[in-house]
Amino acid sequence: GLIPGAGGTQRVPRLAGITQEIMGFLMAGTPFTPKKALSAGLIHEVTDKDNLIEAAKKYILDGGKAVQPWDEKSYKFPGGLPYTPKGMMIWGAASSSLRKMSYNNYPAQSAILSALYEGVQVPIDAGLRIEARYFTKVVMDPVSQNMVRSLFVNMQALNKGARRPKEFDKYDVKKIGILGAGLMGAGIAYVTAKAGIEVVLIDQDQENAEKGKDYSVKLLDKALSRKKTTEEKKEKLLSLITPTTDYALLKGADLIVEAVFENREIKAEVTAKAEAQIAENAVFGSNTSTLPISGLAQNSSRPNNFIGIHYFSPVEKMPLVEIIMGEKTSQETLAKTMDYVQKIKKTPIVVNDSRGFYTSRVFGTYTGEGVAMLAEGIKPALIENAGKMTGMPMAPLALADAVALDLAWKVTTQTKKDFEAEGKDFPITPMYSIMEEMVDKQGRFGKKNSKGFYEYPENGKKYLWPELSNLCKESEDQPDVEELKKRFLYIQAIETAKCYEENVLTDVRDADIGAILGWGMAPWTGGPLSFIDMVGIKDFVAEADKLAQKYGERFTPCKLLRDMAAKNESFHKSGNSSQAA
């Protein structure tokens, strides 16, 4: 959320010139390898740590200068002056790239470009003053303040175990069992073995279990081809994964992670088989993304050791793990689980049990709002562009396809059955009708079968399914894109506030970090609760009421928000990010 304000925007171009690569380095934070930095002229020499002192001495003895290049009388700007006709061509392209990359949501990136453009046209002392002014402007911007608080201060706190119960000793997980060798189970096996933990990967037949291990082989072969690992490290990691059908091999496991299909009967069966083999104090974690943990724990002989461990796909890339506390989950089990998550170098958030927990529940509002807009007759392309313009990593309909429409429909139909079993009315909305049409009648499951809201040709780019305009008749009057952007952000923030009110969330850090890392909520907001604070609680509630009048009760602010508005409170009070003010 900040700019490199200690001279970075002025020294870098004077060392390496103004190129597209340098623009990416400064504006997007694109990392440079030492070799790349050397070739760009950003550093003098690359050496290993054992030879560091000798290299420094040699640099001095060989006539290394204390004078910076730009202070030399003979200095020439690398690649030619940036304000010549040739040099000026780069700025137009940079402005276009910035717009495409950020949709003007990030003040820091705009400030970097301005500091570069203005600073390289004057002597460096004046350039540094220009940079300092832009740095001050960015520091005072609420977007930067939100990002620093969420992505630096609060994320560091969570990574260091801020939510871990302190009264328990460190739990050293040395062996785990993974039940289910599908995509999730295979990914969990890889990140766990990478942390040096022995893995027993179980599936119903040996071939599937072997395929699960092969996933690690493919990832390691790719890393090997990119020189990110060695053959020795590859073999060491693979030696830690044992694919099998034999539950007896779970003996001695400190932790079990169940990653089978979202089916209560199958989960109950594998739970019983695993618990028959493991120690009384071992932790049993379920990777369910939607089924309530307390219900699954009823099939456990030790519900106090039962906990939800929700990974995100692909496991090896996604940095978040959502830990779900069941009604009977003990604090010791939470502490043990957090020690494991810390060991595999993921960021943990802790939530209480409910349908969809936190991340799946709120994530669904983003894609659901996209489908609702479609039902209103809003053009699909406008919906998709508005989603990306809010700062979301993917457009809503494309994201729904990627997650799988049939999976979302299964969750919806299961929820409907559960509502009916509890004697509650399940609302049949236009969204429900569209999903029923897409999955049950059209057989469009999303990217997985190459047809969803988009078509996925074997050779070529995906494109919106042309028949969508017939499925949902387009309205003649199309809304302003700013209205759509507002809906996408507000619906996520409102549902998050409901989670906080219902005690699903108990810490605002979990809410904000979980949203950004879990489903990619626009990082410039700092997360959904930071977004509410940035808008201002009174203004947020007033605007939400307007949206509710126009689009339905899903936008109606919950009692917590109304109470906070009456007292003019905020979620992040000064000096304390763990609870509402």
Predicted feature residues:
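N-terminal glycine-rich phosphate-binding loop for ADP-containing cofactors
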Residues: 2-581
